[in-house]
Amino acid sequence: MIKQAIEKVVNHENLTFEETEAVLDEIMNGEASEVQTASLLTALTAKNPTIDEIAGAAASMRSHALAFPETKDVLEIVGTGGDHANTFNISTTSAIVVAATGTRVAKHGNRAASSKSGAADVLEALGLDINETPAVSYESLQENNLAFLFAQEYHKSMKYVAPVRKQLGFRTIFNILGPLANPAHPTHQLLGVYDETLLEPLANVLKKLGVTNAMVVHGRDGLDEMTTADETAVVELQDDHLTKYTVTPEQFGLKRSQRADLVGGTPEANANITRRILAGDHGPQRDIVLLNAGAALHVAHPDLSIQAGIDLAAKTIDDAKPLKNSIRLLAFSDKRKDVVA
């Protein structure tokens, strides 16, 4: 299958969803050589992957992932990475805040790729056991409204792709597959992207993958997040319909920040930023978390406007709920480690 797929893509022909899923299955099963994998990834990059190709590849990744118990009405807050902005962990902090409102969040993430601190790095620095089994993570989702699914633990088949990606050294379809391959199969998703041209295609991909409500966002300062330093371009998926619009921080009563205000550092430094936000510190770091948490709450609860989501996130922080919930989460993680030990 992979030989025929390479030939088609080299000739600038598009693969169907089914063809892409089948050829990725070959790669994920270790049945393709590194040369074949590199050839396919290079040809897809040169052609530009279609919606069907991205969705088919994501479906294959999901099917080869470590199984996660079936969940309903679960939210994901995630970015593609690759914006080279070195911000603190905005989406991870936002996920902690959103979970404290009673909304279930299954956060799928990895260690840092283009930054100093990925979701796994900062959560580990906060004291969470990032290597929890699916059963334990599912239990955490039910008890604490928050679970972390460590990509390295769930996507073992990526071992057949990782060396090729490293040697190629340029962006491939896999740079956008991570946020689409959450084993919890989220029904609602706030997805940040590093390139504005990805907004509409990835909104359509999410639709194909069964996501019912989503916002795909790109900060025009380059962030793969809702930004407070510039406008944010949005494509929203709701009821099978896509809507394009832009937002500014000012329209939600938030001050415009400088990009320098949002820069983070090591996992330990970013963990301290998260702790300060959860403890009630005000300023640009809190504001960008409020914006992203508010958008995520709108995605999870469409009857709630972004502004109402921001207000709820602010009240939740001021009531110390995220701080208390994070303490419960860490206590739960420690308890489960003791049980396993």
From Swiss-Prot:
Name of a matching Pfam family: Glycos_transf_3
Organism per entry: Lacticaseibacillus casei
Pathway, per record: Amino-acid biosynthesis; L-tryptophan biosynthesis; L-tryptophan from chorismate: step 2/5
Protein name per its UniProtKB record: Anthranilate phosphoribosyltransferase
A biological process term (GO) from this entry: L-tryptophan biosynthetic process
Cofactor: Mg(2+)
EC code: 2.4.2.18
EC category: transferase
Name of the gene this protein is made from: trpD
Keyword Plastid: no
